[in-house]
Curated annotation (Swiss-Prot):
<keyword id="KW-0539">Nucleus</keyword>
<dbReference type="GO" id="GO:0000932">
    <property type="term" value="C:P-body"/>
</dbReference>
<dbReference type="InterPro" id="IPR026780">
    <property type="entry name" value="PNRC1/2"/>
</dbReference>
<protein>
    <recommendedName>
        <fullName>Proline-rich nuclear receptor coactivator 2</fullName>
    </recommendedName>
</protein>
<keyword id="KW-0963">Cytoplasm</keyword>
<dbReference type="Pfam" id="PF15365">
    <property type="entry name" value="PNRC"/>
</dbReference>
<feature type="short sequence motif" description="SH3-binding">
    <location>
        <begin position="109"/>
        <end position="115"/>
    </location>
</feature>
<dbReference type="GO" id="GO:0000184">
    <property type="term" value="P:nuclear-transcribed mRNA catabolic process, nonsense-mediated decay"/>
</dbReference>
<feature type="region of interest" description="Disordered">
    <location>
        <begin position="1"/>
        <end position="69"/>
    </location>
</feature>
<keyword id="KW-0010">Activator</keyword>
<comment type="function">
    <text>Involved in nonsense-mediated mRNA decay (NMD) by acting as a bridge between the mRNA decapping complex and the NMD machinery. May act by targeting the NMD machinery to the P-body and recruiting the decapping machinery to aberrant mRNAs. Required for upf1/rent1 localization to the P-body. Also acts as a nuclear receptor coactivator.</text>
</comment>
<comment type="similarity">
    <text>Belongs to the PNRC family. PNRC2 subfamily.</text>
</comment>
<keyword id="KW-0866">Nonsense-mediated mRNA decay</keyword>
<dbReference type="GO" id="GO:0000956">
    <property type="term" value="P:nuclear-transcribed mRNA catabolic process"/>
</dbReference>
<keyword id="KW-0804">Transcription</keyword>
<dbReference type="GO" id="GO:0005634">
    <property type="term" value="C:nucleus"/>
</dbReference>
<dbReference type="InterPro" id="IPR028322">
    <property type="entry name" value="PNRC-like_rgn"/>
</dbReference>
Amino acid sequence: MGGGERYNIPDRPAPKKSQPVSRGKQRSRDQNGVMHSAASGALGVPHHLRRGEKGTSYSWSPEARQAVSVDKKNGSVRFATPYDQNWESHLNKLLSAQCGQNYAGAKFSEPPSPSVLPKPPSHWVSLPMGDHRELMTFQLKSLLKVQA
């Protein structure tokens, strides 16, 4: 009933002896103004691209970062554009311009002809009346064992 042994496998290779080990992250900007951190890995690969996390990663433009501010405490997102308090009036204007009159439901000109309607399954449909009566009388006679 023995289980397999568990090992702690590090995410990144152990640092070489010649490289100084630093606990803090050192950040620098390249020619394009992109931030790189020394602790992010080899060859300047960003940390979020190097590690195999779920989800897609994308970078925000400076305009997008400026337009959206995230409230860390509540976890809510606030947009830089002011909230329009008159959204109901705008909605009513939009709906009145589209419709022009109140919507009362679907309108039908005529009912469809029976030939256009789909056929119901055979076990839903009753047998023709003549055959049905004969079958019913036979079943009743056999059940009651009465001779006619």
